[in-house]
Amino acid sequence: TGDEDVFPTYLEVSFSNVCNLKCTYCAPEASSRWVEELKAHGPVKLIEGTPYEQWAQGYQDLDSLQYKNREVNPYVDAFWKWFPEAYKHLKVLRITGGEPLMSKETLKTMDFLLEKPNPDLEFAINTNLMVPDKLWDQFILKLVAMRDAECVKKLTIFTSVEAWGK
């Protein structure tokens, strides 16, 4: 009838674009460092007439991306109202970013999973692994607790190696 609730089985969520890096393949929507770069130096100069020229000009209004950096985010608030019911139907939950380990919502999500185990859920996080030690330690403690509690079917960490050395 169209009135039924529909819940996803796969959910990818980004709580924030706060990030400590500006990877070459990333964009301001997913990296606050790219927002800072574009505000300081303007859009990247691209070859005129290419499809990418129009893409770069789309970043003229960088303030529209700042809601993701605010302490109070209406989208995150809405997520937490919706998630407890949707969670029951999930098979895969993946947190992306920004850098997810820099968002308090990531640890809050992990706490939720510990409190409400789902043995059918695959839980994944994308991370650059370059966060301060305090955040890293908190994350590892939560991961170990999740593993020991067997509160999810599978834990996966996705990362990339953008560069190495100095």
For every predicted segment, state its role:
Residues E4-D5, W82:
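Donor nucleotide-activated moiety binding/catalytic core segment of transferases
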Residues E85-A86, F112:
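A short, Lys/Arg-enriched amphipathic alpha-helix followed by its capping loop at the start of a domain
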Residues T109-E115:
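Conserved Walker B catalytic segment
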Residues L21-Y25:
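C-type cytochrome heme c attachment motif
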Residues P8-V18, E29-P74, Y87-E105, K116-K166:
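Core AdoMet radical
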Residues W80, M110, I140-V144:
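Generic structural signal for well-ordered alpha-helices
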Residues P74-W82:
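Conserved RecA-like ASCE ATPase "motif II neighborhood" in helicase/translocase motors
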